[in-house]
Amino acid sequence: QAKGFLVEEMVPPPVGELLVGLRRDPVYGVSLTIGTGGITAELLGDTQTLILPVNADEVLAAISRLRLAPLLTGYRGKPQADLAAAITAIMAMANAMQNDARLDEIEVNPLMVASRGNGAIAADAVIWINDDQGE
């Protein structure tokens, strides 16, 4: 007898996988870390860190500095990744962190980036909320 169901969307293999992490620090403010994601995130240690606020051009520049970047831009005839969708998702997370002081940390790994025009999907995410804001 089933007690529940889990329904998940099937997605095609991504062009690339990103790690996106945002962390609030009382001294430095909010930092944004973008890196090669998925199962190789810790193995490769391929990350770029920015301090918020950031704009889309700065996020694109950080992605472009990753060792993963050639795979996202059509390496050896492969499809190009939907970087616009990835940047939109990253900017939405950054804006959420800036606009809600209760958010301590957001981590998405992987952000699966599909081929151009096909979006980016957060396959796994964790959000830490600080309820000690007096609200």
Predicted regions and their residues:
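ATP-dependent carboxylate/acyl-activation modules
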Residues: 1-135
